[in-house]
Amino acid sequence: MDIDPYKEFGATVELLSFLPSDFFPSVRDLXDTASALYREALESPEHCSPHHTALRQAILCWGKLMTLATWVGNNLEDPASRDLVVNYVNTNMGLKIRQLLWFHISCLTFGRETVLEYLVSFGVWIRTPPAYRPPNAPILSTLPETTVVRRRDRGRSPRRRTPSPRRRRSQSPRRRRSQSRESQC
């Protein structure tokens, strides 16, 4: 079963894969950040948001994974096998947990739309050949100042506010006909 943990939040594993693995802070730093910013909400028995729930689950999952890794480390006698297991957990599972924690902390801190815009911007930037792209990658904390995302919060897009001239013309003859029919009756 291929489950994408970002799907319900409007992102995908592929979208996050554009960010290099060294982009994400350590699990310890991310867990400390989540705790410092959202401890009350994470420990609350009440539901706060899907991001809080996902953060809570990722932190619990990492704790269980560390318990398992410790058990394996203590019970595997072959040092080569032990190292393989520890490296696999840290490299593969660690990266996935770091991505999850970063995504949900960022969504809670900056807003989901801003984070998605950042992921798209970074994806475009990284895929653009170096000769044709700006020297610096987009920065999440400055993104709200430079993107269109803020305009969406203020109101509708211009396309919705102003109907196209075609619509106006096609609606007005119908109105005239219906009004004239009513006046004839």
From Swiss-Prot:
Residues 179-185 are annotated as: RNA binding. Keywords: Capsid protein, Cytoplasmic inwards viral transport, DNA-binding, Host cytoplasm, Host-virus interaction, Microtubular inwards viral transport, Phosphoprotein, Repeat, RNA-binding, T=4 icosahedral capsid protein, Viral penetration into host nucleus, Virion, Virus entry into host cell. Residues 136-185 are annotated as: Disordered. GO terms for cellular component: host cell; host cell cytoplasm; T=4 icosahedral viral capsid. Sequence repeats lie at residues 157-163, 164-171, 172-179. It is found in: Virion; Host cytoplasm. One of its GO terms (molecular function) is RNA binding. GO terms for biological process: microtubule-dependent intracellular transport of viral material towards nucleus; symbiont entry into host cell; viral penetration into host nucleus. Belongs to the orthohepadnavirus core antigen family. This is Capsid protein. It comes from Hepatitis B virus genotype A1 subtype adw (isolate Philippines/pFDW294/1988) (HBV-A). The gene is C.
